[in-house]
Structures are given as structure tokens and as C-alpha cells.
């Protein structure tokens, strides 16, 4: 049996996830963005805000690579400004959805070559776009863990609770 999950489903899920995070962060305040990423990190991202900027800048840069554009420098996007981060995220998402909408069907499975850090990689746009979305999902899960470990109660972010692919969640009344 084949079950199809499209890139559009993953985009819809990550759009929902971003809205959920933005709403939660606005309620908590920008201090959450300064929470440290932990002592065992690799040193690239020192705070929740820096990890969020990385989510959005990675998306933008993968679109840049697939579009043959110069790589976006995201260093000027402040990592301590909720609205600024999500505005950058809206811009990167607009570019990704435009790429998905306009990339010809015949090009989705044709490998492209580009530089990634200190390597030259050769991958299909399909793989790069799926990776970009899974990369985001993975990092939001890391952020959820970090904020929980720092005493914040978060929202449910599981795909199951999202509106994507339908379904319904009804909470039962607690019985005393």
C-alpha cells in the first residue's frame, strides 16, 4: 500500500507550527529567545533565538542554492526580536513556496550541485526541499525541549494535533 504525503502537507504543518510558536512566544516575551542552547551544543547556536534564525536562514539559503542566487546573509536579523525573526521566516517561506510552485515537474528529480559549508553536494531539489522542512521540524523539537527544561510549559506541536490532513481532537472534561 502506498501512502502519499506531499511537500505541501509538510509546508502546511510547518506553517501551523510557526504560527503556534509565534503566538506562544509573544505570550512569554522575548526573554525566551535568550535561553541558552545548553552546554553540550556545537557552539554554532548559543540561544533559542539564534536557533530560530538558523531555521529560517537555512530555508532561505537552500532556496538561494536551488535558484542559483547568492546566499543570503542572515547575520543582521536580530536573534532577540520575536517579530523580526518571524518576519524573516515569512520571507523565507514565501520564497520556498514560490520555488515549489514554479519549479517545473521535470526538474524535481534532476540532481543539482552546490556548495554546502566545506563540501560540494549533488542532490535533487525534491530531496533538498524535503530536508529543509524536516530540518525545521527537528529544530522546533529541540527548542521545545530546551524551553521545557527551563521551566516553560509549551503547546502541543505534534503533527497529530495540527489541522493538516484533517482529524479532530476533543478534550474530555476532567473527572473529579
At which residue positions do the language-model features occur?
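Carboxylate-rich helix-loop segments that flank metal/cofactor sites and access channels
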Residues: 105-118
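Helix-adjacent hinge/juxtasegments
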Residues: 68-108
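Short, contiguous pre-domain boundary segments
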Residues: 2-3
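Short, contiguous alpha-helical
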Residues: 8-27, 32-75, 117-176
